[in-house]
Amino acid sequence: MSLQAIIEAAFERRAEITPKTVDAETRAAIEEVIEGLDSGKYRVAEKIDGEWVTHQWLKKAVLLSFRINDNQIIDGAETKYYDKVALKFADYTEERFAQEGFRVVPSATVRKGAYISKNCVLMPSYVNIGAYVGEGTMVDTWATVGSCAQIGKNVHLSGGVGIGGVLEPLQANPTIIGDNCFIGARSEVVEGVIVEDGCVISMGVFIGQSTRIYDRETGEIHYGRVPAGSVVVSGSLPSKCGKYSLYCAVIVKKVDAKTLGKVGINELLRTIEE
């Protein structure tokens, strides 16, 4: 059986799988997928012919990984943890950090099965299993990258940003942030929403699948997708009865030179000398 076939078959009988009952073939397949996600060999979602495609079997492997492992003690800097998923950097040496070429500030936490690309900076933040963080991206203080979320190249996730995962509540597709995006402080993008390349999301914007994304220039309303190059702020739209207003996200304009100047990436913070 192929790796995918083993995972698909195991997922159908997931309720029966425990750390004591899992067979060797299934355990090996799940662990191979987690290692592949950890190294960047596999991605839960990727862009193919201009469209984002989710590889559901990889997401299923992530979910199955919680069925095959018992909780265990995990050593931290000043404390201990008790969890089923190991920490990504538990066995990293100085040489391996230098080779992979990203910076990790104290208190940043990355779970095994997440991939961090070269020239990334992880401030005290959290990156969950199955996530992919693209080259040159900054994950700022208290930002959270949810399970299986896909973060593009040269992205800035500002302080306190939340990028939703797929594990709980269970989501069909991961949340995706395209290349060269800026996500403002304390904003939340969840429920498999796709923010296309080159967008700027202002501070305190919340976007889920049911959030209306209103383009003030065209009057068009989008759901679940922010078009490429959009500048988005929080706002509201009137109800049909006109008695109250409901929250929405507003596309106020397309990214221009002035906007880029305000949110430009500081290469001095990214590049690690080889």
From Swiss-Prot:
Localisation: Cytoplasm
Q: Where does substrate bind?
A: 103, 140
Task: Write down the Pfam families for this protein, in alphabetical order.
Answer: Hexapep_2, THDPS_N_2
- What EC number(s) does the entry state? 2.3.1.117
Catalytic class of the enzyme: transferase
Question: Where would you say this protein principally sits, based on its record?
Answer: cytoplasm
Q: What does the subunit comment say?
A: Homotrimer.
Identify the NCBIfam families for this entry: dapD (TIGR00965), PRK11830.1 (NF008808)
Family per similarity comment = Belongs to the transferase hexapeptide repeat family.
The protein's name is 2,3,4,5-tetrahydropyridine-2,6-dicarboxylate N-succinyltransferase
Write the lineage as a comma-separated list.
Bacteria, Pseudomonadati, Pseudomonadota, Gammaproteobacteria, Pasteurellales
